[in-house]
């Protein structure tokens, strides 16, 4: 079957990557609008209604507008924005979390692609909370290092400009008021009573993300955390072709340093349990533009259209 797809907002970083990836696949027919019509509500409505699936690569307000424009159609919506990730009636597009999540993506009319930082946090926390190893009322903290491509076209231009300012040479913490837009999904999808303290950091490299959750043994419901947390994550992701858990020898291959840009260009995600049985670090390593963005969208689209989950992914 040929699927008609309209990417609303294909001019942005995520939209362009999705468009280019789908253009290489014969099962998709891509609807496009001329430049002068891409913000025209009537033209967008017509394209959305003509599509089998509309992929929204827009700011939150515009994504909500597109969903409203889709009313009265049978078009399925795949939204990459923050607007609907914890909204009732929307499937959360991280199918590795559970059969329920996978089935919701497969059959849902409305699917929300997870946030990049949130993906790394939830991949680690959600299975451990579900298993009871992390209490639901745990007071967690998390820091996340990302390449500057996560900031979109404007930030990419700032970092790559000949006239860039010296402050861009250093890592830059942001989200300083603990109101980052990924926090609601980090809490809700992980089934936590409290949102974590979240410290995102953007650094001077293009792509790649490393999310870390530091823990004391006293925060956990286990006596041998490194062994037990690793075993839990390995069991949870045993059947996943995309998310995997590294063994000690795999971690040792990094030589004592984990480069956050190592997964650039990949759509996979690697998880690690580091430290010792008193002080532990849970780490996820992936491309913010891959499993953190366009790769996750392609994975969801594959499931929505009945294609093999990894079709078109670079693992």
Put a short name on every predicted segment.
Residues 9, 13, 116-123, 177-184, ...:
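Conserved active-site and cofactor/substrate-binding residues in soluble primary-metabolism enzymes
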Residues 178-206, 210-212:
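Oxyanion-binding "anion nests"
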Residues 2-174, 274-276:
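N-terminal Rossmann-like NAD(P) cofactor-binding subdomain of oxidoreductases
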Residues 31, 197-199, 246:
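General small-molecule cofactor/ligand-binding pocket signal
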Residues 214-315:
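C-terminal active-site/capping subdomain that shapes the small-molecule cofactor and substrate pocket
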Residues 19, 122-129, 183-187, 230, ...:
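Predominant activation on well-ordered alpha-helical scaffold segments within soluble catalytic domains
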Residues 107-109, 209-211, 278-280:
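Short amphipathic alpha-helical segments
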């Amino acid at each position: 079957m040929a699927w008609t797809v309209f990417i609303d907002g294909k001019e942005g970083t995520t939209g362009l990557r999705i468009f280019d990836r789908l253009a290489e696949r014969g099962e998709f027919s891509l609807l496009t609008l001329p430049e002068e019509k891409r913000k025209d509500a009537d033209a967008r409505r017509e394209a959305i209604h003509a599509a089998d699936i509309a992929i929204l690569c827009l700011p939150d307000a515009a994504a909500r507008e597109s969903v409203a424009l889709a009313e009265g159609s049978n078009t399925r919506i795949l939204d990459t924005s923050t607007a609907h990730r914890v909204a009732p009636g929307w499937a959360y597009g991280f199918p590795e979390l559970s059969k329920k999540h996978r089935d919701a993506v497969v059959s849902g009319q409305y699917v929300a692609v997870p946030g990049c930082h949130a993906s790394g946090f939830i991949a680690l926390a959600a299975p451990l909370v579900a298993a009871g190893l992390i209490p639901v009322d745990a007071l967690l903290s998390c820091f996340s290092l990302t390449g500057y491509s996560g900031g979109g076209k404007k930030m990419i231009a700032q970092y790559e400009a000949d006239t860039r300012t010296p402050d861009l040479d250093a890592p830059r913490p942001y989200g300083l008021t603990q109101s980052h837009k990924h926090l609601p999904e980090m809490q809700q999808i992980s089934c936590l009573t409290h949102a974590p303290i979240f410290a995102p950091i953007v650094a001077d490299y293009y792509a790649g993300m490393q999310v870390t959750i530091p823990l004391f043994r006293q925060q956990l419901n286990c006596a041998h955390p490194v062994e037990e947390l690793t075993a839990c994550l390995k069991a949870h992701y045993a059947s996943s072709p995309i998310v995997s858990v590294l063994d000690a020898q795999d971690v040792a291959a990094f030589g004592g340093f984990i480069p956050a840009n190592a997964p650039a260009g990949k759509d996979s995600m690697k998880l690690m349990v580091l430290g010792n049985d008193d002080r532990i670090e849970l780490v996820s390593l992936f491309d913010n533009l891959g499993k953190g963005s366009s790769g996750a969208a392609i994975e969801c689209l594959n499931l929505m259209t009945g294609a093999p989950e990894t079709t078109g992914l670079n693992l």
